Amino acid sequence: MKRPLLTFLLFIFGLSKLFALENHPTGARSLALSNAFVSISDTWSTFHNQAGLALFKQFSAGVYYESKFAIEELSLTASSLILPVNAGTFGFSFSQFGKGSFKENKVGLAFAKSLSEKIHAGIQLDYFSQRFPENSNAFGFATFETGIIYSPNKKLFLGAHIFNPISGGIETNEGKQKMSAIFRVGGHYQFDEMILISVETQKEAETPFLIKTGIEFYPVQNLAFRFGVSGKPVNYTTGLGYGFRKVTTDIGFSYHGNLGLTPSISVQFKL
């Protein structure tokens, strides 16, 4: 644990701001690509763009762990389950940020469907809850997110996603703690089976546009190298992925110039 760094963050940002409600992205592959992931179909599409679930033809599940700035109290754990059926694809997700007296939970139920060979859409109902000493009496709240993916061909994919358009939030003793709406749009191009380049822009209320880019390449079969950059402030990301039969394992690292390294790992299964 990095107690001095945690104390410093609390002093600079304050408890309420540091632990403000947030929709945390998950998946070590996504983190390694600087979360430029709005157009990518993946086990963790339940946290990025539910439209990506429509591209799944088989059951998939994953578990994820992240240690923000290598501080145990700021850890993030998550799980995702994808179940294709005749009518479309269901997704179930859960995440928990924090540890000890502070915990922030998100539960999601998603449904996605291919509207045509090129257009895919998805929607997810979310329930957020948060607990720490200053808001022990706070209640959770429900919201939703929805997205679309368009693929004019087998190499180019374009995606758009909006989270919490109703700007819901938790009622506390100090008033309503709102959660910002987030809009993301971007795309990726698969040059061949070895190279993928992804670009995304994100807009959150009262904050500047955030540009995110990532590149993934396979020097050999089943082994992926990933790099990304986003800002401002500038964050650099990198990671590896390895697949063996029906299991893939990814590790990702994000580096913040002032706050340090955030390591992550995820494991995905397909049946």
Where are these predicted regions, by residue range?
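Sec-dependent N-terminal signal peptides
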Residues: 4-14
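Outer-membrane beta-barrel porins/channels
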Residues: 19-30, 37-41, 58-61, 66-271
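Alpha-helix capping/hinge segments and adjacent helical runs
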Residues: 34-36, 42, 47-53
